[in-house]
Swiss-Prot record:
It comes from the Archaea. One of its GO terms (biological process) is leucyl-tRNA aminoacylation. SUPFAM superfamilies: Anticodon-binding domain of a subclass of class I aminoacyl-tRNA synthetases (SSF47323), Nucleotidylyl transferase (SSF52374), ValRS/IleRS/LeuRS editing domain (SSF50677). Its EC number is 6.1.1.4. Its main location: cytoplasm. This is Leucine--tRNA ligase. Pfam families: Anticodon_1 (PF08264), tRNA-synt_1 (PF00133). Belongs to the class-I aminoacyl-tRNA synthetase family.
């Protein structure tokens, strides 16, 4: 081995060997298979550290399973459909300054190449090459024979087949539905199309129609039941309002809304015409009619009303909304004469409509006063609002003032009341984003009620029932995300599945539409199996007929008929079908948590719709995001750390180890330079250890006579092997690395510090295999240096041997270590230079007391009185009656706080502490730098300060001269 660890040299060497040996190409054989997939990357930029985490987790699982003897298929494709790549090409073609800057300096595209990427096709070709290069650089064990892009003509045939079959099942419908919409592109937008607001959802509001003469001033609310408690409306005097003619279902009305709201209304299923501007001042101070109660309410000025939210006019419920109460109270002494308001606003009576266990009649007033909130601008106002809203929603019940709705839980009234409001023309539904959304083209998006749009009928209860069944049979990792998936299924509504612009596959039964980018990425895992035969040159485009897909993917029809129709050999058709039957279903789909409400959900829906139950996915795993020095990464805006630049700077294995060890599962990771530098130092230590062991030439086996420290090392190794396998099975990569590296390296250091050397080769042999899924290049290099000809990637992963677990050795070594630590702490605190150290092991009666406590706790939880009574009943112990209560009161808390296992091992194995410490005396003397003498507290030959009385089992008393 080289003297120093040179990651790039090692990594290039082994990537070349893997590529030449084809060891990651997987075809059916007699082994048990494991088919793992991760979402293929979207090619509108270079892969970044966020991709690195998801992809590397997938690779670790694949490598682990491969070393456990599974036949592992880990394939990869490239997603390019939709509008982002088209939009990027247009920006590059127009030399948009921000785009050119981001893609040259953050994505690292050379300045002479970037301007040439001015068509979608050129962008796809460029980023496809770059993505594969980056994935190879970091060492992913991918079967590259199966790669494809979602604009391949053969893939389009596959998508056409899928949508024809979904339409035949009645799962694709045509109608009107609210969708995220870019007015500039005149297209629905999905998450991949969005510049800002990727996590925004479409929220259904209820518009309450407050009337003033022949005008309607609509107010949007998520809580229509609070209309019973409205005392006034809020109008912003600085906002531009308009009068509009609004017609829906033959009903014509004139509405007053903000200009921003007017624009949004034009995208709804209403006919909307501008009539005239309306000065804000003219609608402040007017008296309107509450459409539910018939009460008269006044409109008041409020600068906090945002024109872009809802209608730009807000209803006020001061009894239940802290902001409304504070805003109204802030106006009590204001001069509102310019609006013609002369009333004393203190005369406005709060209206209580919800009974909440934690509050009295007016929750908003109560919480404002109890929290000491001075005005509406106080920081605590937002917190107060959330508290009241949460408690009312989850525990509130409507009062008698709500009439026939009395007794309804707040959480269940919205749909019922909204339905009634619409029927009486007192309200309408209105859709709004949960946060602003901007298309990648730079245009603010709107919620558009599209007519004649194609939708996937995800609201279909029978379809949902199959998804629930699938989920109930699946493993969800981590398990707590099961509820998240079930809730998302419950809430999922019909979704637009087609667009008019972008890259993609034409809807086979309506060629004017293109299938949108999430809709064509649901069952592509099955296409990986077909892609193998496409790569081999066995299939032509025209042979990919509906009957072909029906047979090879669904088993419908027969091979002879498919052969006759397509011209394919019957044996080939049957071979493809057998490959599908071997590999399917997907054993694990691993992805980032941002894809739970969309891609992962649609993955389940489409699988249960098309495939038989035995082919439904078996497991889903979810992981968190990656930020860069505390900032969210963005391919289009920055900051960004590309996968290639990370590997170029630090090496593949260091990058892998760092990204896998910084956070667990759904926790978000933060890439920090200090952290990656630390990972480099740790990997250096591992390399140095391996080099030293190999160069020593020692090859001791387990048949060698073992000392206590050897038995300890063997036992610890078995536990780390066991814990690593358990962690990897649950895809807890941080926990796995903690056990297979950080904890283990500490124990190896202790083993060497204690003079252990007989098992160093055994340790390395297991350690290097434990680490192979995480740092595969380095481990291949070490494995080869150890004399192995076959790659470590195909070696047997370590499995723990329970026969080698030695609890006694572990307890004994823990006692030695803790004794040394105690001595060192005393020396540090006293600042003395020890001349001699005396150790006193526990007297026999205390050891017996521990044994009795262990037996007693089997029957019932330990209690002071019961243990004292038991000990005092023992004639041998009774003579220590004065000391027993103190000792019992000391050890019981230790038993209850996690010390029971140590004491049980001590008692049942009969650890001889005096013999142990005498055997370890030379080690202690070397560490402390002075002589050490060991006595039993039962007969101390030298104890000038009576320290022996403090001796306890596993904690000898110490006297230092």
């Amino acid at each position: 081995m080289e003297q120093d660890y040179k990651p790039h040299e090692i990594e290039e060497k082994w990537q070349k060997k893997w590529n030449e040996s084809l060891i990651f190409q997987a075809d059916p054989d007699k082994r048990e298979k494991f088919f793992i997939t991760i979402p293929y990357p979207y090619l509108n930029g270079n892969l970044h550290a966020g991709h690195t985490r998801t992809f590397t987790i997938g690779d670790v699982v694949a490598r682990h399973k491969r070393m456990l003897g599974y036949n592992v298929l880990y394939p990869m494709g490239f997603h390019v459909t939709g509008t982002p790549i088209v939009g990027l090409a247009e920006l590059i073609a127009s030399r948009d300054p921000q785009t050119m800057d981001v893609y040259e300096h953050l994505h690292g595209i050379p300045g002479d190449i970037l301007p040439t990427l001015d068509t979608p096709e050129k962008i796809v070709d460029y980023f496809k090459r770059e993505a594969e290069k980056a994935m190879r650089m970091i060492g992913y064990s991918i079967d590259w024979r199966r790669k494809f892009t979602t604009t391949d003509p053969t893939y389009k045939k596959f998508i056409e087949w899928q949508y024809i079959r979904l339409e035949e099942k009645g799962l694709i419908v045509k109608g009107s539905h609210p969708v995220k919409w870019c007015p500039n592109d005149n297209n629905p937008v999905e998450d991949h199309d969005i510049l800002y607001g990727e996590e925004a959802t479409i929220v259904e509001y209820t518009l309450i129609k407050f009337r003033y003469n022949d005008l309607v001033l609509p107010c949007a609310t998520l809580r229509p039941e609070t209309t019973f408690g409205v005392t006034n409306l809020w109008v912003n005097p600085d906002v531009d309002y308009v009068k509009a003619r609004v017609e829906k279902d033959g009903n014509e009305e004139f509405w007053v809304v903000s200009k921003e709201a007017f624009r949004k209304l034009t995208f709804t299923d209403r006919t909307v015409e501008y009539v005239e501007d309306v000065p804000a001042k003219s609608i402040i101070g007017i008296k309107l009619t509450n459409p539910i109660t018939g009460d008269e309410v006044i409109s008041l000025p409020a600068s906090f009303v945002k024109p872009e939210n809802g209608s730009g006019i807000v209803m006020s419920v001061p009894a239940h909304a802290p902001f409304d109460y504070l805003a109204l109270r802030d106006l009590y002494d204001a001069d509102l004469s310019e609006y013609g308001i002369t009333e004393d606003l203190r005369d406005i009576k709060l209206i209580s409509l919800i009974q909440v266990p934690e509050f009295g009649e007016f929750p908003a007033k109560e919480i404002v006063e109890s929290m000491g909130i001075a005005n509406q601008k106080a920081p605590k106002a937002e917190e107060a609002t959330k508290i009241v809203y949460r408690r009312e929603f989850h525990g509130g019940v409507l009062k008698e003032i709500t009439g026939k709705y009395r007794g309804y839980p707040v959480s269940k009234i919205k749909d019922v009341l909204t339905r009634d409001l619409i029927a009486s023309n007192a309200g309408e539904t209105f859709y709004e984003f949960s946060e602003p959304v901007v298309c990648r083209c730079g245009t603010p998006c709107v919620v558009n009620m599209v007519k004649g749009q194609w939708f996937l009928n995800y609201s279909n209860p029978e379809w949902k029932a199959k998804v629930y069944k699938c989920l109930s049979q699946m493993r969800i990792i981590p398990e707590e995300y099961r509820v998240e998936f079930e809730n998302k299924v419950d809430w999922l509504k019909d979704k637009a599945c087609a667009r008019r612009k972008g890259l993609g596959t034409r809807l086979p039964f309506d060629k004017e539409w293109l299938i949108e980018s999430l809709g064509d990425s649901t069952i592509y895992m099955s296409y990986y199996i077909i892609a193998r035969f496409l790569e081999r040159g066995d299939l032509a485009l025209e042979q990919l007929t509906l009957s072909f897909f029906d047979y090879v993917l669904l088993g419908i029809g027969d091979s002879a008929a498919v052969s006759a129709e397509t011209g394919l050999k019957q044996e080939l058709v049957e071979e493809i079908r057998s490959h599908f039957n071997y590999w399917y279903p997907v054993d694990l789909r691993s992805s980032g948590k941002d894809l739970v409400p969309n891609h992962l959900l649609f993955f389940l829906f489409h699988h249960v719709a098309l495939f038989e139950e035995e082919k439904w996915p078996r497991a889903l795993a979810v992981n968190g995001f990656v930020s860069l020095e505390g900032q969210k990464m963005s391919k289009s805006k920055g900051p960004i750390l590309t996968l290639e630049s990370a590997v170029s700077a630090y090496g593949a294995d260091i990058t892998r180890m760092y990204i896998l060890s910084t956070a667990e599962q759904t926790q978000d990771a933060d890439w920090q330079k200090t952290g990656i530098d630390s990972a480099r130092r740790q990997v250096d230590r591992f390399y140095s250890f391996a080099k030293d062991v190999i160069e020593s030439g020692k090859r001791a086996t387990l048949s060698t006579e073992l000392k206590l420290i050897d038995r300890w090392m063997l036992s610890r190794m078995q536990k780390y092997i066991m814990e690593t396998n358990i962690a990897l099975d649950s895809i807890q990569t941080r926990e796995a690395i903690q056990n297979s590296f950080f904890l283990l390296i500490n124990d190896v250091r202790w083993y060497q510090r204690r003079g252990g050397e007989a098992l160093l080769y055994y340790v390395l042999d297991n350690w290097v295999r434990l680490m192979a899924p995480f740092t595969p290049h380095l481990c291949e290099e070490i494995w080869e240096a150890m004399g192995h000809e076959d790659p470590i990637s195909l070696a047997q992963y370590p499995l723990d041997n329970e026969d080698l677990i030695d609890e006694g050795a572990e307890l004994a070594e823990e006692a030695v270590k803790s004794t040394l630590n105690d001595i060192e702490e005393i020396v540090r605190v006293t600042k003395m230079t020890p001349q001699k150290v005396y150790l006193y092991t526990a007297p026999a009666w205390k050891a017996e007391a521990i044994r009795c406590a262990c037996e007693l706790q089997i029957e019932a939880p330990l209690e002071v009185g019961a243990l004292i009574k038991t000990l005092m009943a023992n004639p041998e112990l009774k003579r220590f009656g004065k000391e027993i209560p103190k000792f019992v009161q000391k050890i019981i808390p230790e038993f209850k706080s996690g010390g029971a296992e140590r004491y049980e091992t001590f008692a049942y194995l009969g650890l001889d502490e005096q013999a142990l410490l005498k055997e370890s005396a030379s080690f202690l003397e070397k560490e402390i730098g002075c002589p050490v003498e060991i006595y039993s507290a039962d007969s101390p030959e030298y104890d000038p300060q009576k320290k022996s009385r403090f001796a306890e089992p596993l904690r000898p008393a110490i006297y230092i001269e």
